[in-house]
């Protein structure tokens, strides 16, 4: 079953649906571990698929009718070319087809294991997917990133494309080219055979004597209704309607096979052009009804925030991550004149894009003073500018040195400092219980928010040269309005 994580990335997890079943639930006590089906090594493993038998029967029918009946009826100067061209194509198709069926496309670590014993039954109560973190829970081996577990073969296939029922084998990285050569050779051979059958069928009504150039027909000049088949090795007498019926049946089957093989070949050419596999194409074009589970998981991921909402969310998160003494209330509105109600608080327990859910302790009754100089200075910490300008028409600038004692009295100290060259983890900073410094926080912001810092900073003539801390708002005493103030 195809799944997506809540960060909109397709996961490398494929669970069997039909061939691998889960044990029925017992009313009391855990059920004993049962054994599932065995893994199939290649296309010769038992049982054969019905479409595989149909493919072999069609190959025999085309070969017998083409080489035994139709090609010997061609004019004598065309017979050698007919045998040579069609024989080479049919022989080449047989070789690549047998090779594609015989190759084991499983992952290298799976091939190193023994196929003797059956695999355990997949239990969905213990694992959500068969492959998790590049480890197959059924094959019990580490697999590559492009490997998928085939439910029909019950094994992990490297570079999985699809399970071909005509080959009764999976098509993966090891036999994909052989599969394409098999399809192309089959299409070319059927096209030539249809052309020969059409010529014989039409020429029988136009000039049947052109079909009787073989030396065996010289003794039957007065019996035009008698024909020979399987020339020249084992001539067998037959009637004209039988040859016409076989030629018409071959034309119909050949046209049907040409349409199917041509569509399949064009489809795989399209996939190669776009560098996709059949599995990836099916997943991308899966109808929306089958992706309801994915949408339900995506609902828990917060939507993309605007820059102002992003700053507010950072401030709330820093407040949550900073330990406070028990019994002490959170920061209230420091300056109601310069405060503004915040956006609605996120739902407690909402899961972010990675990591455990963040429980934000926020009082809905108290507005968030998101423009308060105290909170801005507390969030910036040592990276704050020397002066904080109020909104236009609302008083002069406020020096940060006068605000720092008020910050310490109200318990709005800056977050814990981190090393300057700290390596930022791949998970978002909001999902970790560690407080990151202000420059790290700004690097985590959106490009639009970072642009606001640079736009105001470059307006100052005393902007320091670009270096390790060039993104931080250091203005060397300049009274510049900070963003969102």
From Swiss-Prot:
Signal peptide: none annotated. Residues 1-271 are annotated as: Mediates interaction with STING1. The active site is at residue 164. It comes from the Eukaryota. It catalyses: L-cysteinyl-[protein] + hexadecanoyl-CoA = S-hexadecanoyl-L-cysteinyl-[protein] + CoA. Residues 1-41, 324-358, 462-485 are annotated as: Disordered. Belongs to the DHHC palmitoyltransferase family. This is Palmitoyltransferase ZDHHC1. It comes from Homo sapiens (Human).
